[in-house]
Swiss-Prot record:
It is an enzyme of class 2 (transferase). It comes from Lactobacillus gasseri (strain ATCC 33323 / DSM 20243 / BCRC 14619 / CIP 102991 / JCM 1131 / KCTC 3163 / NCIMB 11718 / NCTC 13722 / AM63). This is DNA-directed RNA polymerase subunit omega. Keywords: DNA-directed RNA polymerase, Nucleotidyltransferase, Transcription, Transferase. HAMAP family: RNApol_bact_RpoZ (MF_00366). GO terms for molecular function: DNA binding; DNA-directed RNA polymerase activity. Promotes RNA polymerase assembly. Latches the N- and C-terminal regions of the beta' subunit thereby facilitating its interaction with the beta and alpha subunits. GO terms for biological process: DNA-templated transcription. The gene is rpoZ. Its EC number is 2.7.7.6. PANTHER family: DNA-DIRECTED RNA POLYMERASE SUBUNIT OMEGA.
Length: 72
């Protein structure tokens, strides 16, 4: 699968590693699938992972420094 939007460069500017990005996106996607409120009004993606990546790119979802050990 190739990610074209949001760009990987924009996503990596929000987190410090690809590993942290993948864990953060997966956790947020699970929250979205479980019915958590969405952080944006409009999404390009229909899938939870795509929505999570869009939220990360927009700066709406970040890693909490106090719980950083949960991410890696």
């Amino acid at each position: 699968m190739k990610i074209t939007y949001p760009s990987i460069d924009k996503l990596l500017s929000r987190v410090n590693s690809r590993y942290s990005l993948s864990v953060l996106a997966a956790k947020r996607a699970h929250e979205i699938q479980a019915g958590a409120p969405l952080a944006l009004k409009h999404y390009k993606s229909d899938k939870a992972v795509g929505k999570a990546l869009e939220e990360i790119a927009a700066g709406k979802v970040t890693i909490d420094p106090e719980h950083r050990e949960d991410i890696g």
